[in-house]
């Protein structure tokens, strides 16, 4: 699909979400996982773009297909064993991006069969706390938001959630 999108080696990529900042960090994370360094997120997504009065185009965009060489970034992914180890190590932090209710097991899960609650030892930082008016909070506020949740941004962090979308928001904020 990247070839048809004309995304290739050396491309600079800007991703955005139609409703603000929600799934764009997951796309950003996917590109970073496969070695793309020049990938960015349009903060606030399409709504912010429109509010700023920027041009909008309609219709299909035709581009020349390009070659992409994936370079897997193992450090961007934690498997089950990695997470178990992280939970057992005192210097590691596993941070769950789901709502407080889902984390505590008092709120419903959106997907059938997904158990409530959280991994023992995990910390909770609902992803919405990192947003303000549909955009990521200012850089100087990011560390404060993490700190208020009992998370030390100076120590290693593994982010998690129910599907990988909201965990990517936390990861993006940590990289911002």
Residue ranges and their predicted role:
Residues 43, 115, 119, 160-162:
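Short glycine/serine/threonine-biased micro-segments
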Residues 16, 95-97, 160:
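Short hydrophobic segments within beta-strands
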Residues 1-90, 106, 162-176:
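Thiolate-centered catalytic microenvironments shared by cysteine-dependent enzyme domains
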Residues 1-8, 79-154:
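Positively charged, proline/Ser/Thr-rich regional signature most characteristic
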Residues 13, 155-158:
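Alpha/beta-hydrolase fold nucleophile elbow
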